[in-house]
Amino acid sequence: MTATIIDGKIIATELRARVAVEVARLKKDHSLTPGLAVVLVGNDPASEVYVRNKGIATTEAGMNSFEFKLPAETSEADVLAKVRELNADPAVHGFLVQFPVPNHISQQAVIDAIDPVKDADGLHPLNAGRLASGLPAMVPATPEGCVIMAKRAGGDLSGKHAVIIGRSNLVGKPVAQLLLKENCTVTIAHSRSRDLPSIARQADILVAAVGRPGMVRGDWVKPGAVVIDVGINRVPAPEKGEGKTRLVGDVLFDEAAEVAGAITPVPGGVGLMTVACLLRNTVIAACRQNGIALPQDF
């Protein structure tokens, strides 16, 4: 068996097109232009690329893009002051602070300071609690992208067994909540789980989000399963030249693709969906803040 490739570029492009249509409607009918802001502390190369791509995508969707680059030595107090400034800015409907931040800044303190209604990344404890309670919430972009891709590949997910490898607040826990909402039977596995390969082999939907390159082997995959690889790991690539690297996922792609029914590639998979879902979240936030109803299928 050779798996169908779940093309993140195609699905993300479709979602971004829907976002652009909704942005155009908001401009025409309500004179409202959604705005997404990103705060970057320091000069991490991967974060800089990611922030730049977010800005391009935001502008292409017809939205306002705001970027704030702060030096790595910026104090936690000054970062929190910038967060409060964005909380109060009516032109900014959604924003995020790009992680990781320097070690002297508490990531949780930053998350807690964000106004939950502007929490484009869906990480605030209030949004996490509402998601767990089945209430309307800002949903983390990467988990939302995972579920969209799983539904595209697997259709109706109701009754299927989903196994998530990873229990982070950023991906593992929220993707589990979203799959429960889709009426899946959900198992969360992690580094302390016993006999992890046998747990993974039970999955109709296998989500790998552990940050370990190639951890999930082909014999971990149930034949015909949908495999969603959230990992983005940079590993040495001597074949490209001295000091060169390449991106790989948490799944050993070539092995898993021989067993799975459908699989996301890295790159070209979940990462592209994350940006598209951030744009969608910002439009949702803009509508909620202005009492504007969204289309039912948005």
UniProtKB/Swiss-Prot annotation:
Q: In which pathway does it act?
A: One-carbon metabolism; tetrahydrofolate interconversion
Q: What is its EC number?
A: 1.5.1.5, 3.5.4.9
For this chain, the annotated S-S bridges are none
Any single GO BP term: purine nucleotide biosynthetic process
Q: Which reaction does it catalyse?
A: (6R)-5,10-methylene-5,6,7,8-tetrahydrofolate + NADP(+) = (6R)-5,10-methenyltetrahydrofolate + NADPH; (6R)-5,10-methenyltetrahydrofolate + H2O = (6R)-10-formyltetrahydrofolate + H(+)
Q: Which UniProt keywords apply?
A: Amino-acid biosynthesis, Histidine biosynthesis, Hydrolase, Methionine biosynthesis, Multifunctional enzyme, NADP, One-carbon metabolism, Oxidoreductase, Purine biosynthesis
Can you list the GO cellular component terms from the UniProt entry? cytosol
Q: Name one GO molecular function term.
A: methylenetetrahydrofolate dehydrogenase (NADP+) activity
Write down a Pfam family by its short name. THF_DHG_CYH_C
Q: Does the keyword Hydrolase apply?
A: yes
Amino acids binding NADP(+)? 166-168, 191, 232
Query: Which NCBIfam families would you find in this protein's record?
Result: PRK14186.1, PRK14188.1
Would you identify the family this protein belongs to, as annotated? Belongs to the tetrahydrofolate dehydrogenase/cyclohydrolase family.
What quaternary structure, including any partners, is listed in this protein's UniProt entry?
Homodimer.
Summarize the protein's role: Catalyzes the oxidation of 5,10-methylenetetrahydrofolate to 5,10-methenyltetrahydrofolate and then the hydrolysis of 5,10-methenyltetrahydrofolate to 10-formyltetrahydrofolate.
* Protein known as: Bifunctional protein FolD
Q: What is the lineage of its organism?
A: Bacteria, Pseudomonadati, Pseudomonadota, Alphaproteobacteria, Hyphomicrobiales
Name the gene that codes for it. Answer: folD
